[in-house]
Amino acid sequence: MTLEITAAMVKDLREKTNVGMMDCKKALQETGGDLEKAVDLLRQKGLAKAMKRAGKEASEGMVHAYIHAGGRIGVLIEVNCETDFAAKSEDFVEFVKNVAMQVAATNPLGIVPEDISQDVVERERAIYLAQAQESGKPQNILEKMVEGKMRKFFEESTLLQQSYVKDPDKTIQDYLNELTASIGEKIIIRRFARFQLGSE
């Protein structure tokens, strides 16, 4: 019997290593859900380079405010890193500003899929299932169609999975990984809030 890898386990490993969700899930599957072994495995693969300071908290960083489109859209974002030195680096500051612009442009529902309310996810799934059922295809094909549409939904509505607007060949997660590798510190997009004139 294989252990089910839960979203909470993946999120926990991701917060420890700052490695992408799929790599975290794969590492947990390969280590039977053992968090410490999964951390070691990611380090061996070179994915968790910033883990050489595993005990260090990402408590530095910056909060940035971005106002777009003549004052009609505003974003507040908090991005954390481990040291004040990194927080003041040009690359880090540019990253925070670029991610704030991304949020303004794309209006994500969360940073990772787990941030999106279950109600929203279930509603999307129900809509996609109803659409798929109209095709008259067998149940196993319907499930694959729905899974494909849900994957696309998360790619469009979660910040880390979105294509980066300034370089659509990579995701925000790729951009974050590149910065993590170049400054050698854990970086976490902690939270954001997007405001649009006239919307709730």
Curated annotation (Swiss-Prot):
Q: What does this protein do?
A: Associates with the EF-Tu.GDP complex and induces the exchange of GDP to GTP. It remains bound to the aminoacyl-tRNA.EF-Tu.GTP complex up to the GTP hydrolysis stage on the ribosome.
Please give the Gene3D superfamilies that the UniProt record associates with this protein. Answer: 1.10.286.20, DNA helicase RuvA subunit, C-terminal domain (1.10.8.10), Elongation factor Ts, dimerisation domain (3.30.479.20)
Annotated localization: Cytoplasm
Q: Name one Pfam family in it.
A: EF_TS
Organism, scientific name? Syntrophobacter fumaroxidans (strain DSM 10017 / MPOB)
Q: Which GO terms describe its cellular component?
A: cytoplasm
Q: Which PANTHER family match?
A: ELONGATION FACTOR TS (PTHR11741), ELONGATION FACTOR TS, MITOCHONDRIAL (PTHR11741:SF0)
The gene from which this protein is expressed is tsf
Whether Protein biosynthesis counts among this entry's keywords is: yes
| The protein's name in its UniProt record | Elongation factor Ts
